[in-house]
Amino acid sequence: SITREINQIAEGLKHAPDEFRGLSKLLADKYFCNFSLFQSLPDSWAIDQIFPIMPIQRLDEKPDRSATLQDITCDSDGKIANFISTRNVAHYLPVHSLKKTEPYYVAVFLVGAYQEILGDMHNLFGDTNAVHVSVNEKGYNIEQIIDGETVAEVLDLSLIHISEPTRRS
């Protein structure tokens, strides 16, 4: 679009007009992610903690889009719009254009058990998958892979047992 072209030109200017300074933030795409911000990253919304976040695929390609991350809870109020950058806080995450035929994975790092405890059970999402990785001089080692909860497990925790016949009114 014309607005994106103007923004690209303005970003290259040494002294861009003030009116163009917030344009990148306004033009960022919204990438909807399969998680609940309130459950998985409660400190992100509660105290504005910024976690390292990045795409974990297509790393040999330069990102061509900018996005904020939205959750898919009932109200989609969960939004991550502040990201760690090389100089200061960025208001969007560099991402790749989505391809219809493949999922796009983004990872949040340095979350820890504290977020799990605070998050509890929100919007029936259950625990997400987690990977524990250690790094040393020789590279990295995947220490543990923890599967998230299935829909059946989450419903069971809510005392809804899918193995029992359902009564319809």
Which sequence ranges carry the predicted segments?
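Single conserved hydrophobic/aromatic residue that forms the stacking wall/gate
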Residues: I160-S169
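Hard-cation-handling environments
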Residues: S1-A28
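Generic long, charged, amphipathic alpha-helical segments
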Residues: D64-A81
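Short, compositionally biased
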Residues: L118-N136
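Short, Lys/Arg- and Gly-enriched loop/turn segments at beta-strand edges
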Residues: Y114-M121, N141-I142
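Short, glycine-/Ser/Thr-/acidic-enriched flexible segments
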Residues: S36-S40, C74-S76, V111-Q115, N136-K138
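Conserved, mostly hydrophobic/aromatic
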Residues: C33, P103
